[in-house]
Structures are given as C-alpha cells and as structure tokens.
C-alpha cells in the first residue's frame, strides 16, 4: 500500500461511495479516517453507531457540505480531485466489498448476517442459555422445597392420627372400666336386697357419684392437654414455614444480585472490548495512512510526541514501522481535564490577587488615616508652641518667592522655640550639604493626579514620586508630589547650627509629613487586574537612603508582611534632570536641586514632564511595558 494505486481504480471506488472524503478537507489523518468511518456507517444504515462516533470524538469529524464540489475548506493542498488518501481509501473499501459483498445491509436481500451481527447474536444466545439454566436451577430448588414441605405435612398428619387413635383407645378403656364397675355395682345391689332399702340406695349413690365425677374431670383434662399440644404443634409448623419462606426470599435476592453483577460485568467487558477494538482500528489506520499532517510528515510528528526518556522507541533509518506503532491518539477527556485544571488555577490566582489587593487597600486606608491624625497633631502642637504667630501657609504650586520667605521666617521662629520637631532634612540636601529650609507642614498635593508641575514654576522644586493616599481609577501609577523650596542665604542666629548639629530623639510619627524620602511606586487596580501573584513578584533594589530615617516609615515600607522589603525607585528622566538642576543653581537660589537618582527601569517610559500641573490625569506618567509578557509563559500566554 506504499505506492498509490492507478486512477481508474480510485474513480471506480469513489463512485461506490455516496460522500467521498478528500485531503482538501483536512490535513489531519485521524480526522479523515473518522470521516470515512462516519460516511461508511451512514451509507450502511448504521445511524446509531455514526452518532456514537460523533459523540465520542467531540464532533471533530469534518462533514461534507451541500455544494457540488463536496467541501468548502480553503486548506492548502493539490488541486487534483483524486488525491492519494481518497484513492487509497476507495481502493480499500472496494476490496472489502468485493471480498464480502454482504457487508452492506442495504444491498443484502438474502438476510445473511455480518460478522458483527453474528457476534451480537451469539452473545444473546449465550445470555439466554445462562438465563434458562438459572431458571431451571431455581425451579429445581423450588420443587425440592415443596417436596420437603409435603413430607413434613404427611408426617405431622400421621402423628396427629396416632395421637387421636391413642386418645380414642384411652376413652374406650375408661368407658369399659365404667361399664365393668356399673355391672359390679348392679351385682352388689342384687346381693344386698335383703338389707334396708334406704341404706342400700344411699350407699349405691355415694359409691357411684365420686367415680363418675372423677372420670369426667380426667377426660376433660386429657382433652385440654391434647388441644394445647395441637396448638403448639401448629405454631411450630407456622414458624418453620415462615423461616423457610424467608430463606427462599433471601436466596432469590442473592441470585438476582449475582445475575445483575454478572450482567454489569459482561456489559463492561463488552464496552471495553469495543473501545479497544475501535482504538486499535484507529491506531492501525492512522499508522498505515501516509498522509501529510499540517505540512509535516507523520514520522516527524510521532518523533516529537515521544518522550525524550525512551531511547529505545526512537526511529532507526532501517525500521520505519516502529515509528508508526508508537503513536498514541490523544483522548478528548484528558484535554478537557487539562482545560478545567487551567481554568481552576486561573480562578484561584484571581481570588488570591483580589484578597491581596483588598488587604493592600485596607492597609493604605489605615495609613492615610494615621497620616491625617499625625497632621492634626502636628498642627495643634505648632499652634500651641507659637500662639502669637499665624499658621504657616501651604504653597500649592510655589509661584512666588514672597510666600517662600514668609514660610522660612515662620519656620525659623518655630525652630527657635522647638528645635526637636525640625530635626531631619531630606537626603538630597544632605548630599549637597547646603542650608535649605523645609516648611513645618507637609506640602502635599490635594489630588494624586498632578504628577509633575509646570516647567516654568518648577525651577525651585525637586520632583519625586511617593505613595499617594488616593487610588486612581485610570492610570497605572499613583504619585504624591512633595516640593522643596530653596531659601536665600540669610544670617542665621547661633541657635540654628546647634539645632542642626544636635541629634536629639524626636517623635518620628509626627515627622512623617516633613520628610522627602526616595519615592516608592504603587501599583493600582489597573496593574493588579492581571493574573499575577504578588508572592511570585520579585521586587527591585531600593536605595539606602531610607535606612537612617528611623521607624517613621514602617507603615510605608511594610506593604507586604511588614518587613523591610526592596522597593521600586523612579527618578526624573536624565534629560529633564540635566535641564532643571543647572537652572536652579544658576538662579542663585542657594543650592537648589537634589542629586540625580538612578533609573532602574530601562523598559519603562514616563511622560514628557511638561504638564501644566492643573490636576489633569491625561498628563500623568504611564508605564508602557507589557507586564504580562515579561512575567513568564504558560498554557495561557502562548
């Protein structure tokens, strides 16, 4: 069968089939084989088997269309009508029909049974014979039980008759004794007639009366005893009959259960045999068919499907038949189970992400409430410490220098009164070692959407990212901006360097709003909507600037498991940092601008930083990196 048959034979074979199948429909040899089987069952009138084949194969059998051409699939293949597979199958069916013309039931008027039907008839005959044998056994058992019952009844009747005969004999003996005694009494009366008549009659009555009463009482007692014995015997007989009936019923039930089990086992064996036969037929046909599958030879596909740990199954150049014998058809049940397992894993991952996101949001809400309380406490303390000074105003956009001078003066006076509350300065100011004043109130933006201020108004500002108390609904990041204003160099009193040089302990919780640390990035709902596990997320290295800030940032740094974890750090783009910091130093502002911080993300693109600072979310920085593609691969990411 390795060479293709001539075309005239294939045409004759195709004419015999009502709906031929060609390679144009599918490149999968298994699907084509199933299609041929389906058409064969349909043409031979086996519609039930055809439907069962469709159900078992999950409707993967390609069906013919109503067009005159036969099939409408636009698969790549030769333009010839008579392809190799069509010719081969046509020749195969023609040979089978010529060898056994009785295979087709539609053209079988003589009623000769096919081998399949013969097997079915034989199985039915065997089942009938087994049932008949079981019925005969049951009948024989029933007959034996009936004979035993009849024998027992005869024995009981004989016993009763014997007892009745014995009772009659006793009664006759009693009657005879009575008659003999009466005769003796009559003789005694005749002999004693010479005596007084009254005395004789009394003596006779006294002698006769006790004897008659005793005899009657004894007869009654014997009758009662006999009746009681008969009742006991009847009860025993009834109990024995009930026990026998129960035993018979139990035996019948056991026999029925055994029959049912045998039938079930037979059915299972038949189903297994059918499945094995069907799989063998499919495997042999798929092994023998030399059709090209998806543009690749079948031998290569079989080599790919084999495990690498079985070198004995690898094909040799001399033996190509071993490759065909090692193929295994993929069952649809395993495919369904794998899909169900994958969906369950996705659901579990989503549930874990949702629970972790809720925990994160709850922690952030508590953190925001703590910050608000700290702000209120700091405001109350500042008001109590400086009762004669007005509260320091919070510059929103740092537009003028007059507001900067007023805030710096208020800060100097507050530092003179309470040097403990203004202990720390930013990391950027420590690197440059220039005197910079920081306002007492946290200069925080009202909304988290303003990520960068205007270029004209940001000459004296160091832009960094921080965790914002509000979650954005649109963006990928939420930032909090803190601004820092350089002050003109002014003569400072002697108490100021002392307050700066001294390292006094202070309440770090009250100074959380006065810090400008390296800013951490927060991922909001848009990032967590992906199927990612937070436990598997590797965080990035953080700068060491947060190590000397005490315990004030414990709430900020303990987002996961309350440990000092590594964080993601952003900085301004290099071009913008180079453009802004020289302008700050050139204005004579006294050491403006902080040190440039390294950008750990090369694949992350931020905005141009030229937003107007009006609170528009459209100008916020956006991460353009595809996180899902970079977090690994799997069945769902192919």
UniProtKB/Swiss-Prot annotation:
Primary location class: cytoplasm
Composition bias type Polar residues, residue spans: 8-26, 283-295, 466-481
GO biological process per UniProt: cellular response to neutral pH; filamentous growth; filamentous growth of a population of unicellular organisms in response to neutral pH; positive regulation of filamentous growth of a population of unicellular organisms in response to neutral pH; positive regulation of transcription by RNA polymerase II
GO-annotated molecular function: DNA-binding transcription factor activity
Any GO CC annotation of this UniProt entry: nucleus
Region annotation (Disordered) ranges: 1-26, 187-216, 270-331, 362-515, 572-638
Composition bias type Basic residues, residue spans: 412-423
Keyword Transcription regulation: yes
InterPro entries: LisH (IPR006594)
Residue ranges with Gly residues bias: 586-595
Intracellular or extracellular location(s): Cytoplasm; Nucleus
Domain LisH: 29-61
Superkingdom as given in the UniProt entry: Eukaryota
Biased composition (Low complexity): 296-328, 369-387, 394-408, 425-465, 495-515, 572-585
Span of the signal peptide: none
Stored SMART domains: LisH
Keywords: Activator, Cytoplasm, Nucleus, Transcription, Transcription regulation
Stated role: Transcription factor that regulates pseudohyphal differentiation, invasive growth, floculation, adhesion and starch metabolism in response to nutrient availability.
Subunit field text: Interacts with FLO8.
Family in the record: Belongs to the MSS11 family.
Protein name per the record: Transcription activator MSS11
Originating organism: Candida albicans (strain SC5314 / ATCC MYA-2876) (Yeast)
């Amino acid at each position: 069968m390795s060479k293709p048959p001539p075309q005239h034979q294939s045409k004759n074979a195709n004419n015999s089939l009502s709906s031929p199948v060609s390679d144009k429909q599918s490149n999968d040899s298994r699907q084509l084989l199933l299609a041929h089987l389906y058409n064969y069952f349909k043409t031979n009138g086996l519609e039930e088997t055809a439907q069962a084949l469709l159900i078992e194969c999950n409707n993967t059998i390609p069906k013919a269309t109503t067009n005159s051409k036969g099939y409408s699939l636009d698969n790549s293949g030769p333009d010839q009508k008579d392809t190799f597979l069509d010719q081969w199958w046509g020749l195969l069916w023609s040979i089978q029909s010529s060898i056994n013309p009785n295979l087709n039931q539609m053209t079988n008027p003589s009623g000769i049974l096919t081998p399949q039907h013969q097997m079915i008839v034989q199985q039915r005959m065997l089942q009938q014979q087994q049932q008949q044998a079981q019925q005969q056994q049951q009948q024989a058992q029933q007959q034996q039980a009936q004979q035993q019952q009849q024998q027992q009844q005869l024995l009981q009747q004989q016993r009763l008759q014997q007892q009745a005969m014995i009772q009659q004999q006793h009664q006759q003996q009693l009657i005879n004794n009575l008659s003999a005694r009466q005769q003796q009494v009559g003789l005694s009366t005749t002999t004693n007639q010479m005596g007084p008549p009254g005395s004789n009659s009394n003596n006779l009555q006294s002698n006769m009366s006790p004897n008659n009463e005793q005899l009657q009482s004894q007869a009654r007692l014997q009758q009662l005893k006999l009746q009681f014995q008969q009742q006991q015997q009847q009860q025993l007989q009834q109990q024995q009959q009930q026990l026998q009936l129960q035993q018979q019923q139990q035996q019948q039930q056991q026999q029925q259960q055994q029959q049912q089990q045998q039938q079930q086992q037979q059915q299972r064996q038949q189903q297994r045999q059918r499945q094995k036969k069907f799989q063998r037929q499919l495997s042999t046909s798929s092994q023998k068919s030399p059709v090209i599958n998806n543009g690749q030879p079948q031998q290569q596909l079989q080599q790919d499907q084999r495990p690498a740990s079985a070198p004995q199954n690898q094909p040799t150049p001399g033996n190509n038949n071993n490759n065909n014998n090692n193929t295994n058809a993929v069952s649809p049940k395993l495919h369904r189970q794998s899909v169900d397992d994958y969906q369950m894993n996705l659901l579990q991952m989503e549930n874990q992400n949702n629970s972790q996101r809720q925990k994160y949001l709850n922690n952030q809400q508590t953190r925001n409430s703590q910050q608000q309380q700290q702000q209120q406490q700091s405001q109350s303390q500042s008001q109590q410490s400086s009762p004669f000074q007005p509260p320091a105003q919070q510059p929103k956009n740092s537009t003028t220098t007059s507001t900067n001078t007023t805030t710096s003066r208020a800060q100097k006076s507050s530092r003179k009164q309470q040097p403990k509350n203004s202990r720390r300065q930013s990391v950027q100011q420590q690197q440059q070692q220039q005197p910079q004043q920081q306002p007492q109130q946290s200069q925080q933006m009202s909304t988290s959407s303003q990520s960068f201020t205007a270029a004209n108004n940001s000459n004296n500002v160091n832009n960094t990212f921080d965790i914002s108390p509000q979650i954005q609904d649109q963006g990928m990041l939420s930032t909090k901006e803190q601004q820092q204003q350089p002050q003109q160099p002014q003569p400072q009193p002697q108490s100021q360097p002392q307050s700066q040089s001294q390292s006094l302990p202070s309440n770090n919780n009250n100074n959380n709003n006065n810090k400008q640390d390296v800013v951490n990035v927060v991922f909001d709902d848009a990032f967590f909507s992906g199927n990612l596990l937070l436990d598997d997320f590797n965080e990035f290295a953080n700068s060491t600037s947060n190590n000397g800030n005490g315990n004030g940032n414990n709430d900020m740094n303990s987002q996961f498991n309350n440990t000092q974890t590594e964080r993601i750090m952003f900085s301004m783009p290099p071009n913008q940092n180079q453009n802004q910091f020289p302008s700050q130093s050139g204005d004579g502002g006294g050491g403006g601008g902080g040190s440039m911080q390294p950008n750990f993300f090369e694949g992350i693109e931020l905005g141009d930083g030229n937003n107007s600072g009006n609170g528009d979310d459209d100008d916020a920085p956006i991460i353009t990196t595809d996180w899902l593609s970079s977090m690994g691969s799997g069945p769902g990411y192919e």
